[in-house]
Amino acid sequence: MHCDQCQESIKGGCNVRGVCGKDELTAKLQDTLIYAAEGIALCAEGFEGKIDRKYGQFISECLFVTVTNTNFDDVAIVEQIRKALAMRDEVRALAGTTPAHDAANWSGSTKEEFLAKAAACSIDSLSADPDLRSLKSLILYGIKGLAAYTDHAAVLGYHDDDIYAFYVKGLSALTKELPADELLGLVMECGATAVKAMALLDKANTETYGNPEITTVKTGVGTRPGILISGHDLRDMEDLLKQTEGTGVDVYTHCEMLPAHYYPAFKKYDHFVGNYGNSWWSQDREFESFNGPILMTTNCIVPVRESYRGRMFTTGMAGYPGLKHIPARPDGGSKDFSEIIELAKTCKPPIEIENGEIVGGFAHTQVLALADKVVDAVKSGAIRRFVVMAGCDGRHNSRQYYTDVAETLPKDTVILTAGCAKYRYNKLELGDIGGIPRVLDAGQCNDSYSLAVIAMKLQEVFGLENINDLPISYDIAWYEQKAVTVLLALLFLGVKGIRLGPTLPEFLTPNIATTLVKLFDLKPIGTVEADVEAMMAGN
């Protein structure tokens, strides 16, 4: 295996076992699944870049399976490869052309055949040239992230055919020998498509569940048994809340599901009581103390402990060997969570690990409703600078940097955040500026879109020609592929001077990293003191 797609990849990439817990066989099967998706894209070129929505949505699902910490279940991945090959053959027959590339023509049906195929379709096979391979990796990981966002929107019935068309263009490009400038153009096109994907998901979520509003979320526990729901899928949240109503079972969010509390549609459920725990990487301890069932709707899963294995469930694209998987919902119906609910009734209430409050719900509609107050605070000097600290959290101690930055920033700064990076500072007592909290949480990682909308609105209000003239600095934490997608979206929107940490991606060669620095002033993080001083000076 060779996997370098996440921030915690070891130097040179993970080659024996992933830091995430993924073993060599799972890694190889995921490589083969990506190759099968590339085959679908190649065959779809016969439709002049257009692809039927059914196939586009399926590609989203295939790529989502391979996002870090999403699916470790070899049986499920093998079945997905079989489906992908059948889809590819269907597309090839409909297109009436047969591309010469092996990805469009190979066949197999067994796990052994898929593992054998992996040798020819690993990341290393993208190009013999390290720099071209680096650019192709950037494209692939960007597409993986936007596929996750697009899949969430599709679950709610929202689609954008331009995104599916980019799958065809982008994935096909991975199989071809293209020059660096053309690949760099595709990187930027991936960023443009990422903006579309995040806008689509924002539209899907808000039209379905309402615009997020300022909300105080409790972090303590009640006296009744509970179900803990983690991941990002709001439709799963809706199904679970409806089915648990009146059962005597409470529902708690974990990690990236925290922002579900901000949506008006979910506020009517009295048994939707709070958030339990912190970021994804501490789940092994928190799932143990929760006592009740856990539902993982997407990433992030860490290796499962025996102490809670019997009460942990997966659904959607998530999977883990030995865990019960809740099947997809039938057309027009809901998922059946009855087994989880009945198990919850037999469990003890959660053990309290903290008892406080978190304030969030500052997506673009809510912040723009406060625009006059924010603009006045900027003009008066009460707010000197905004610092965007969106992105991911991770287990390495180096991420203490983000806590320290939040504590070191002057009291006339406001932190704009989205994603699980917030857990590094969203429980600190950082105060407010004239009633505006100094940490404004927009929501999940895809809600970084809200931060971009807010920035563009402020640019308009202040009459600035360039988004980089705003008093906004970007100190982004990344971990997996959705953060890569967010980064590419920001670069496409013209944002420069982004700090990216805690380390630059392992898949970027020195030459490609230098190119990104030159084009976009992308920079690694430094010391807390130096970075805060530079950001406050507009650098």
Swiss-Prot record:
Entry's EC annotation? 1.7.99.1
| GO molecular function, a single term | metal ion binding
The record ties this protein, via InterPro entries, to: HCP/CODH, Hydroxylam_reduct, Prismane-like_a/b-sand, Prismane-like_sf, Prismane_a-bundle
Keyword annotations for this protein, in alphabetical order, are:
4Fe-4S, Cytoplasm, Iron, Iron-sulfur, Metal-binding, Oxidoreductase
Q: Where is the signal peptide?
A: none
The Cysteine persulfide modification is found at: C392
The entry's localization annotation reads: Cytoplasm
Q: Which reaction does it catalyse?
A: A + NH4(+) + H2O = hydroxylamine + AH2 + H(+)
The record ties this protein, via Pfam families, to:
Prismane
Tell me the residue numbers annotated for binding hybrid [4Fe-2O-2S] cluster.
H232, E256, C300, C392, C420, C445, E480, K482
GO biological process terms, alphabetically, are: response to hydrogen peroxide
Source organism, top-level taxon:
Bacteria
Which residues of the sequence carry a binding annotation for [4Fe-4S] cluster?
C3, C6, C14, C20
| GO CC, any one term | cytoplasm
Q: How is the cofactor bound?
A: Binds 1 [4Fe-4S] cluster. Binds 1 hybrid [4Fe-2O-2S] cluster.
Cofactors, names only: [4Fe-4S] cluster; hybrid [4Fe-2O-2S] cluster
* Recorded family membership: Belongs to the HCP family.
Q: What is the protein's known function? A: Catalyzes the reduction of hydroxylamine to form NH(3) and H(2)O.
PANTHER family registered for this protein in UniProt: HYDROXYLAMINE REDUCTASE (PTHR30109:SF0)
Q: What is this protein called?
A: Hydroxylamine reductase
Q: Which organism is it from?
A: Chlorobaculum tepidum (strain ATCC 49652 / DSM 12025 / NBRC 103806 / TLS) (Chlorobium tepidum)
